[in-house]
């Protein structure tokens, strides 16, 4: 039996995502993209953004589609150690997230 999370419980979801993205950019500048520490921080940040976006669709900006970020979130959460999925995660970390976040600004 599946346990589903209720939707639209966090009215500040867009603000939380914006804050997570700001911290993501800070750590990217601080560590650089080749550092494994940044890889872990970025992966967890994208995972959290995907969760917030998927479970709070009513509070997302107009035109924002959470499916790509949530798909990457699933890759991170479930198949993080696989080489092929690691490449997909790196592509999201190195530019894909910035494209998706344009809806928040």
Describe these PLM feature segments.
Residues 1-105:
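Solvent-exposed interaction patches of small proteins and small membrane subunits
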């Amino acid at each position: 039996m599946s346990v589903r999370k209720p939707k639209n419980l966090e009215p500040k979801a867009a603000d939380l995502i914006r804050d997570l993205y700001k911290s993501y950019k800070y750590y990217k500048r601080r560590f650089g993209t080749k550092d494994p520490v940044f890889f872990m921080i970025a992966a967890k940040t994208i995972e959290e953004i995907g969760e917030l976006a998927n479970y709070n669709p009513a509070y997302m900006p107009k035109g924002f589609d959470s499916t790509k970020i949530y798909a990457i979130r699933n890759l991170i959460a479930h198949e993080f150690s696989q080489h092929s999925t690691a490449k997909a995660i790196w592509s999201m970390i190195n530019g894909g997230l910035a494209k998706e976040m344009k809806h928040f600004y």
